[in-house]
Amino acid sequence: TVDMVRSEDDLFRIYPYFPINGNQSFEILYIELDPGASNSSEPHAAGTQEYLIVFGSALELFVGTQKYEILPGNAISFLADQPHMYRNATDKMTTVINVIVYKNE
């Protein structure tokens, strides 16, 4: 069973299928963003890389001062050791597979 994590407004939901633990340096998340939903993340540790695959509708991704629009069926990777935000500016739900790889020290 996967314990869903939801935003206060219930517009953003994360399903941590493979959460981070002491035996692995990655996690795999399934994310649902309702129309208008957004989620900001503080920088992860230096060298952390995120990989996103987008389904449903377009996702706006803000990394530092850069903005990207990822269309359904497309993917992107980025260094997540800076502030970043996901936003669904469409009128349909967006779903994302998110793989976060933490740099081994």
List each language-model region with its residue ranges:
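Short coil/loop residues immediately preceding or within conserved phosphate-binding loops
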Residues: 12, 28, 49, 65, ...
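Ligand-binding loop in jelly-roll beta-barrel domains
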Residues: 10-13, 24, 71, 80-105
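Short, conserved beta-strand element in jelly-roll/cupin
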Residues: 30-34, 44-61
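Short hydrophobic/aromatic patches on the structural cores and recognition surfaces of FHA
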Residues: 17, 57, 73-75
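Short acidic-glycine-tyrosine-enriched beta hairpin
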Residues: 64-80
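Short beta-strand His + acidic residue motifs that chelate non-heme Fe in jelly-roll/DSBH
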Residues: 41, 61-62, 68, 84-90
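A short glycine-rich, His/Asp/Glu-containing loop-to-beta-strand
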Residues: 3-42, 99-103
